[in-house]
Structure formats: structure tokens, C-alpha cells
A protein has these predicted regions:
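Conserved N-terminal structural module of periplasmic/extracytoplasmic solute-binding proteins
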Residues: 2-11, 15-16, 20-115, 134, ...
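Hinge/lid segment of periplasmic solute-binding proteins
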Residues: 37-42, 111-162, 215, 301-303, ...
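C-terminal lobe and pocket-closing loops
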Residues: 47, 284-296, 309-411, 444, ...
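Short helix-initiation/N-cap motifs at beta->coil->alpha
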Residues: 82-93, 112, 183-188, 260-273
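Alpha-to-beta junction loops
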Residues: 97-109, 124, 198-200, 273-282
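A structural signal for short loop-to-beta-strand junctions that line the ligand-binding cleft
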Residues: 103-105, 133-171, 201, 312-316, ...
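Extracytoplasmic/periplasmic solute-binding protein
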Residues: 153-157, 162, 184-233, 240, ...
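Glycine-centered hinge/linker elements that transmit conformational signals in sensory
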Residues: 190, 230-261, 305
Length: 449
């Protein structure tokens, strides 16, 4: 699904959340993190006992999958509540946790925010309830996003491996018949496209760290690390990161790549009117683009990202989320079974993938003909799902997040994002971001490696 990272919580909200570390999470009748494995008898009893669960999620039409769960387990009544997206969603979760009342049982949780809630002991470790047995059902790198040191903090629901959506007609006017295979070819194509058509080969948004981090992910960069306790690693201004951003600075300063904020009217228009000849985006992008630039149907094609070396096939990820269970739940078994079932039952996961167009993290869906064999008219009949399914297998599994990514995203806009918007020194922007992140970590009591 489209990531909700453009507008996140400010530093004060993050600091308040970190203070919750000193709070004791409610055991909730088995909601603690050190529970013995639930026996099958206990699971059967929990699922056959009249129970009310509350599920906070922004996912459109997720009631469809919840209805399937309730048909399977009629004694479980699930109330689906949309309390907002992005900052509103996470702030309300934190407020409910701090107040020790009104918190839901199950919550939608983007991967980059799991560490911050795990730090405050707000998430139930699902491993004792059987989640550790699900690892083989998911792509390796996805499972790493929800697990740490044997604990499992969420059940993956959707992901966003990166690819390249491009206008075949615009590139064709520049004499380009295939998507650039390498970043060197991409830069050459950018010159040709601008000269022949006036279009930008793509746009690099100054307000969206998610896209930049995905590109760094593809480049093998490891900007963050977290030991699960009080030690973090911050390395956003490494030589490799500066090399990658130097590439983009060159294209920006030569006016070959635009720098419009994304998910704005100006940006939507650019996708629809040919200002941008392409969009480096995630697997949720193809369907999103159809709704944004519908009149350009048939003109777009999809490809993997350009590579740093010929013959390579490596990608990064942008977006996606899981379903997590709060540690305060009074019904941990039923809550876990809800999160597990809607993201593992084949009827449910196929519905997510083929009707709501969430890009799947489950191996069996990524191989299912009902999903991968779909031909997309918008992309000239191309099997776009098949392409992105293949790309999903090329994402590096070793990518971590800071336990204060709320501040990570907002400080990006004040540093790297500002440099992009001003078409300035992106290396200096990375240095400033590094300083902001390390200073914040120290102020919050973290040890910085």
C-alpha cells in the first residue's frame, strides 16, 4: 500500500513515546512477552469463547478479510476502526497505551515503526503463540522486518519492493527502446529524454525519505542499526550514501530530474501529463498510478530498477505494513490468531492481493497464477505482478530501522530533503541528517555506535 511517511510525528511526540519505556506493559491475562507456548487446547478454547477484539487499521475494505475470519471463528467479534493514517494512527496508539485504557488489541504497523513500539514493550512477542513457525511462509527479508533476536512483533501483510515504471512512448521519442539496465545507462537516457521531449526521466521527492532510503537499500547501504535495547547505529552519511546521492545531485543540477514534492497536486499532474517519463516506485505503485494517470493507459511499462553493475539484480523496499498485537490485550491468543489468519489463510491473502491490490509478502501468493499471471492493460498487457514478484526476491534481507524513525523522517526533510529541494549539496545534507539523528539519539539516552 502507499506509505504514509510524508507527514509523521514531531520530536516531542517521539520523546513522549520513548518515556513509555519506563512504563510496565499490562500482562492482560497472558499479554506479556515471556509466555509459554500456547497449546492447541488453549487455542481452540480461546477461539470458541465469545470474545470482542478491536482492530485499528487504515487498510481499505479490510472488513472483507475480517468477515472471512469471523465466518471461520463465529465466536470472535472483531470491531474494525480507522483512527487515521500516518501520524494520527500512531499518536492515538501511543496515547491509549500511555493512558492504560482504550487501546485496541490488534494494530496496523508499518515495518519502520516496529522497533519504536518494541522498545517501549508495547508489542506482544508473538513467537510463544506460534508465530516463529510462520517464518518459512514469507520472503526472507520481509520476515526480518518483523522479528529480532527470536521475538516476532508482527505478521507481514504487504510490502513494496522497488521497480521502475516508465512511459514507453516518451522514451521511444528519445530513441530508447528498452528500460535502462544500469544507472549509467539511466543517466544517459535522462539526457536523451530531456533533449528530445522536454520530460524529466523521473522525479526525486524532497519530502519523502522512504524513496531515498529504498534507493540506498538497493545500493547496499545500511544507514541504521538497533540492538533491541539502548544502542543504535547511524550511518546515513557514509561514503557509499554520498556516492549514491552524488549521482542524483548531478542529474538534479543538470535539470534532468525534477524535485517536486510527491503526493501533491503538482506531482499527480506530472504523472498524468508526461512531465515525468518515469517513476521509481514500489510494488504498490502500478495500481496507484492507474488511478492517478488513467488517461495514459497503455503507455506505461514496468521494469526492475537500474543496477550498479551489468547483470546484477538487486532492489530495495519502500512501504508495506504488518499486523501487530499490543501487549495490553486481554485476549492475546485470539488477537494473534486474527493477525495470523487474515495474513495466512489463502482465501484472505489472495483477496488482499487481487481485490485490494496489496502487494503480498507470502511465498505462496507470489507464486500463485491467480496473482502473477494477471495481464495489466494499463501496462500494455504486461504481467506486472510477475515482474514485481521476481523483484521481491532480490531485496537485501539485512536492513534495520532506528527506534525513533518518526524523528528520522521529519529530520530528513530538514536536511537532505531541503538540499534536494534547493538543488544544493546533497552530501552536506547527509552530514546534517547524520548530526541530527546522532544528537537526538544521545539526548534520548541511546548509545550511538
Amino acid at each position: 500500500m502507499v506509505p504514509r511517511t510524508a507527514k509523521m510525528l514531531g520530536a516531542s511526540a517521539v520523546a513522549a513515546a520513548l518515556l513509555l519505556t519506563g512504563c510496565t506493559a499490562s500482562d492482560g491475562g497472558g499479554g506479556g512477552g515471556n509466555q509459554p507456548p500456547a497449546s492447541q487446547d488453549e487455542i481452540d478454547e480461546a477461539l470458541s469463547t465469545p470474545t470482542k477484539l478491536t482492530f485499528w487499521t487504515w487498510v481499505p475494505d479490510i472488513q472483507n478479510e475480517v468477515d472471512l475470519f469471523e465466518e471461520e471463528y463465529p465466536e470472535i467479534d472483531v470491531e474494525v476502526v480507522n483512527v487515521g493514517q500516518g501520524a494520527a494512527h500512531y499518536q492515538k496508539i501511543r496515547t491509549a497505551i500511555e493512558a492504560a485504557e482504550g487501546a485496541p488489541d490488534v494494530v496496523q504497523m508499518e515495518y519502520q515503526y516496529i522497533n519504536s513500539f518494541a522498545l517501549t514493550e508495547s508489542l506482544l512477542d508473538l513467537a510463544p503463540y506460534g508465530a516463529d513457525e510462520l517464518e518459512g511462509d514469507y520472503v526472507d527479508w520481509v520476515w526480518n522486518q518483523v522479528s529480532k533476536d527470536g521475538a516476532v512483533y508482527g505478521i507481514p501483510q504487504d510490502v513494496g519492493p522497488m521497480g521502475n515504471l516508465y512511459r514507453e512512448d516518451i522514451l521511444g521519442k528519445a530513441g530508447i527502446t528498452e528500460a535502462p539496465a544500469t544507472w549509467e545507462e539511466y543517466a544517459t537516457a535522462a539526457e536523451a529524454v530531456k533533449s528530445a521531449t522536454g520530460s524529466y526521466i523521473s522525479n526525486l521527492a524532497p519530502n519523502d525519505a522512504g524513496q531515498i532510503l529504498a534507493l540506498l537499500w538497493q545500493a547496499g547501504e545500511k544507514p541504521f542499526s538497533y540492538d533491541g535495547d539502548q544502542t543504535v547505529g547511524v550511518n546515513v552519511n557514509s561514503d557509499r550514501a554520498k556516492e549514491v546521492m552524488g549521482y542524483w545531485q548531478d542529474l538534479i543540477q543538470r535539470d534532468l530530474v525534477s524535485v517536486d514534492p510527491d503526493f501533491t497536486d503538482q506531482w499527480y499532474q506530472g504523472l498524468a501529463n508526461g512531465k515525468y517519463a518515469g517513476w521509481l516506485t514500489a510494488a504498490w505503485g502500478p495500481v496507484f498510478l492507474q488511478g492517478t494517470a488513467g488517461e495514459t493507459s497503455g503507455l506505461w511499462r514496468a521494469a526492475e530498477l537500474p543496477q550498479y553493475g551489468e547483470g546484477e539484480s538487486v532492489s530495495g523496499n519502500w512501504g508495506g505494513s504488518s499486523d501487530a498485537v499490543l501487549a495490553s490485550t486481554e485476549n492475546p491468543i485470539a488477537a494473534y490468531e486474527l493477525a495470523k489468519w487474515i495474513n495466512n489463510d489463502k482465501a484472505s491473502t489472495l483477496k488482499f492481493a487481487t481485490e485490494q491490490f496489496l502487494f503480498p509478502p507470502q511465498n505462496d501468493v507470489l507464486e500463485d497464477p491467480a496473482f502473477v499471471d494477471q495481464e495489466a492493460e494499463f501496462y500494455g498487457g504486461q504481467k506486472v505482478n510477475q515482474l514485481f514478484s521476481e523483484i521481491s526476491g532480490t531485496v537485501d534481507a539485512d536492513f534495520d530501522w532506528l527506534p525513533y524513525m518518526d524523528y528520522g523522517y521529519s529530520s530528513f526533510e530538514d536536511s537532505v530533503g531541503k538540499a534536494i529541494a534547493e538543488k544544493g549539496d546533497l552530501a552536506a545534507g547527509l552530514d546534517e541528517w547524520q548530526e541530527l539523528l546522532t544528537t537526538y539519539a544521545t539526548d534520548q539516552g541511546f548509545t550511538v555506535e
